[in-house]
């Protein structure tokens, strides 16, 4: 009888080595044409805007995008998710200061960085944690996409309900040369559907924040 493998219990010992490999190696995966088309569909609007840009990556049904747009009324908020099914459930507000886009952020981050986008803030809220140790390279900081995430810059905010993910995210940022702060969330108003669900069932919630425009750690 096969028993399910338990979640990873602590940060990987070789995390810094993996990060160094990603940051020093070119990602050879070609950008998909549908991703390029999705990027071009919003490129002009973003370039024409004088408002600070906030990116809400993997936004799900877009609740977080709408809430961020309400919290930052002077910004242009761009919510991105690859799932047509999830985005179809979004309750749009035609007068809001945000855009919703279906795209794969693996490609979108690279295209945005290559185009010179400079988001003021970037939110990555409750990404799939892939908790098994064998799934490490599927986590954002364990994948080649982490380099593009870093290249975009801006004030990065990541939230998760898994403490190991938060710990590893801090370690990954440190390995890349960036300072970060981590904290447990207690009284914050939920801004995503997942955050509401996790809070209602009593999960511990964690936040990691890093200013990717400030390289503050000496590289060895």
Residue ranges and their predicted role:
Residues 57, 80:
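Conserved beta-strand/loop positions that form the S-adenosyl-L-methionine
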Residues 83:
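Conserved SAM/SAH-binding beta-strand->alpha-helix loop
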Residues 165-172, 176-220:
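Class I S-adenosyl-L-methionine
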Residues 152-160:
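Conserved beta-strand signature within the Rossmann-like core of class I S-adenosyl-L-methionine
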Residues 137-145:
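Charged helix-capping and loop-helix junction motifs
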Residues 58-62:
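Class I SAM-dependent methyltransferase "Motif I" SAM/SAH-binding loop
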Residues 1-53, 63-67, 92-116:
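S-adenosyl-L-methionine
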